[in-house]
């Protein structure tokens, strides 16, 4: 069994166990008030990242790594990106089937992100959302990062939306902090960091504020930046 296959099984088991432990309403945007501002903050960070690179919705070709049901590509549709230029890959076949049903105008493939089939320099933007946190194997993480760089056009951008903190008391998460990003993406040689944008707060704090003190959510993010757990790191591929 390959490392990628082991990771796929681990991710599937995690989400199944997570759903069993937390319940179906845990991340329900409509019915769980804990979720709203966490989602809003994450989306603000993505939109801010796209603005910072002056992304062109009419022309930009985008690849989403670990796309799941396609949720990370949906905001791009709202921003006017061309559906035919939006691509997503995921190793979980059932997630790809859902994405294809929900967004029939987009391109989805069930493939391993450590061995992408796209030619070199295909995409203007390559993004990921929360996949490296669960990718604890350093070799696999390096392979995926190198594939992301390979398929990005020279001077194109990589948007890394991930959690900079792990979960205390468990080894199933590996924080995507700046040290790890520099190691995986060869910052300084293959890529350069252009921006780091704050997103959602660490879940216990963010969920509490979203439900009980929503007016304080973004104030807490600004005044207490160490409480920001999710960030978007904008990398530019060197020529």
Give short role names for the model-derived ranges.
Residues 2-56:
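Conserved class I S-adenosyl-L-methionine
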Residues 63, 69-115:
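Class I SAM-dependent methyltransferase SAM/SAH-binding core
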Residues 127:
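A conserved beta-strand element that flanks and buttresses the S-adenosyl-L-methionine
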Residues 130-134:
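Short catalytic micro-motifs in class I SAM-dependent methyltransferases
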Residues 142-154:
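A short glycine-rich, Lys/Arg-flanked "PGG" loop and its adjoining helix->strand segment in the class I
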Residues 156-162:
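Conserved beta-strand signature within the Rossmann-like core of class I S-adenosyl-L-methionine
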Residues 174-189:
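Short alpha-helix
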Residues 195-239:
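A C-terminal cap/extension of S-adenosyl-L-methionine-dependent methyltransferases
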């Amino acid at each position: 069994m390959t490392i990628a296959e082991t990771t796929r099984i681990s991710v599937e088991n995690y989400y199944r166990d997570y759903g069993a432990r937390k319940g179906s309403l845990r991340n329900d945007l409509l019915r769980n008030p804990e979720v709203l501002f966490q989602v809003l903050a994450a989306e603000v960070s993505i939109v801010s990242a796209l603005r910072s690179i002056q992304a062109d919705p009419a022309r930009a070709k985008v690849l989403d790594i670990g796309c799941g049901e396609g949720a990370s590509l949906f905001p791009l549709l709202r921003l006017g990106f061309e559906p035919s230029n939006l691509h997503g890959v995921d190793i979980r076949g059932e997630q790809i089937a859902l994405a294809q049903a929900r967004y029939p105008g987009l391109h989805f493939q069930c493939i391993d992100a450590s061995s992408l089939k796209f030619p070199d320099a295909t995409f203007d933007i390559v993004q990921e959302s929360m996949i490296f946190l669960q990718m604890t194997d350093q070799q696999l993480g390096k392979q995926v990062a190198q594939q992301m760089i390979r398929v990005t056009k020279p001077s194109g951008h990589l948007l890394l939306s991930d959690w900079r903190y792990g979960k205390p008391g468990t080894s199933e998460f590996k924080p995507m902090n700046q040290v790890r990003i520099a190691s995986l993406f060869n910052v300084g040689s293959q890529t350069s960091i252009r921006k780091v944008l704050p997103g959602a707060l660490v879940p216990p704090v963010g969920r509490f504020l979203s439900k009980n003190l929503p007016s304080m959510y973004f104030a807490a993010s600004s005044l207490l930046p160490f409480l920001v757990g999710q960030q978007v790191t904008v990398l530019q591929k060197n020529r």
